[in-house]
UniProtKB/Swiss-Prot annotation:
Subcellular location: Membrane
Family: Belongs to the tetraspanin (TM4SF) family.
Coiled-coil regions, chain positions: none
Any one annotated GO CC term: membrane
UniProt-annotated glycosylation sites, renumbered to this chain: N34, N187
Keyword rRNA processing listed: no
Descriptive protein name: Tetraspanin-4
Biological process (GO), any one: auxin-activated signaling pathway
Membrane-spanning parts: 7-27, 44-64, 76-96, 236-256, 288-308
The gene coding this protein: TET4
Length: 327
């Protein structure tokens, strides 16, 4: 029995270590929210999940060290819902950042960003007047456009050099006018009309060389924030997927070890417990994978139906809470 308790304790220790990248991802998003992304939403669920995994793992370690069956059971019970929440949250992040990206521009290395290329819940949140008032102020106060200026040995950057810079989505959308407006480059944040506008882009009239205004009220700036959010969320989601896979494997092994500990407490034959150990791991792992797979497929199909019949915000809410309930 002691060896199985040690196994559960070891798994809890590795689970504790896995909470570090989740918590780190939340802290990284929080730092981004205070600089360029400026949307304070996604980081808090990640931070809460990371802290929850840490606390639950410590409880599991204590249960394994003192052979406390209740703490072992509490670890398995709560960890199931934490894993389900992390899976649902990761899927939610992918769904809301599914659409939209920058457009390639001829003779430019950077991309231009257009709000019409984005849709769904995240776009509605960013473009909401109440939210954008705070987001726009955050982008301006972050000084991202002040930092865009460059010079080479004291010589200001030329237009040709600027056109072949790899600008971030926020720099491209908020710090310069859209390319199709036909403005002429003076420096990185000063542009003058250089010809007729190409296409009816309302952002052309919103551009202002006042460094406090620039294009912070342009649709391209909102699209740039969306593009930056998509990149940040996708990076963290990749880490979450890897962590989830490892967590599920650890969870299944811990379940099998806990079942054997229960058998020991119930005075069941040791040999029988050992013989069924591998079979139990295989069947439990298969059962959980099948449940998660069919749950995801069903809820994705249901979410697609909701998008067709209802608005995106309602559909995403149903998807997220429906997945956690199913799990």
């Amino acid at each position: 029995m002691r060896s199985r308790s040690n196994l559960i304790g070891l798994i809890n220790f590795f689970t504790f270590l896995l909470s570090i990248p989740i918590l780190g991802g939340g802290i990284w998003l929080s730092s981004r929210a205070n600089s360029t992304d400026c949307l304070r939403f996604l980081q808090w669920p990640l931070i809460i999940i990371g802290i929850s995994i840490m606390v639950i793992s410590l409880a599991g370690i204590a249960g394994a060290c003192y052979q406390n069956k209740f703490l072992m059971w509490l670890y398995l019970f709560t960890m199931f819902f934490v894993i389900a929440a992390l899976i649902g949250f990761t899927i939610f992040a992918y769904v809301v950042t599914d659409k939209g990206s920058g457009r390639f521009v001829m003779n430019r290395r950077y991309l231009d960003y257009y709000l019409n290329d984005y849709s769904g819940w995240l776009k509605d949140r960013v473009t909401d007047n109440g939210y954008w008032r705070d987001i726009g102020s955050c982008v301006r106060d972050s000084g991202v456009c002040k930092k865009i200026g460059r010079d080479l040995n004291g010589v200001p950057e030329t237009a040709h050099m600027f056109y072949f810079r790899n600008l971030s989505p926020v720099e491209s959308g908020c710090c310069k006018p859209p390319t199709d407006c036909g403005y002429t480059y003076v420096n990185e944040t000063v542009w003058i009309p250089g010809g007729e506008m190409v296409g009816p882009n309302p952002d052309c009239m919103l551009w202002n060389n006042d460094q406090r205004l620039l294009c912070y009220q342009c649709s391209s700036c909102k699209a740039g924030v969306l593009g930056s959010l998509k990149k940040s969320w996708r990076k963290v989601s990749v880490i979450n997927i890897v962590v989830v896979i490892i967590l599920v494997i650890f969870y299944v092994i811990a379940c099998a070890a806990y079942q054997n500990v229960k058998r020991m407490y119930n005075d069941e034959p040791v040999g029988e417990a050992r013989m069924t150990n591998l079979i139990l791991v295989i069947f439990k792992f298969k059962e959980i994978l099948v449940q998660f797979f069919f749950g995801i497929v069903f809820l994705l199909l249901f979410n697609g139906l909701m998008v067709c019949c209802c608005n995106d915000k309602f559909a995403f809410s149903v998807f997220f809470f429906g997945y956690v309930t199913y799990a």
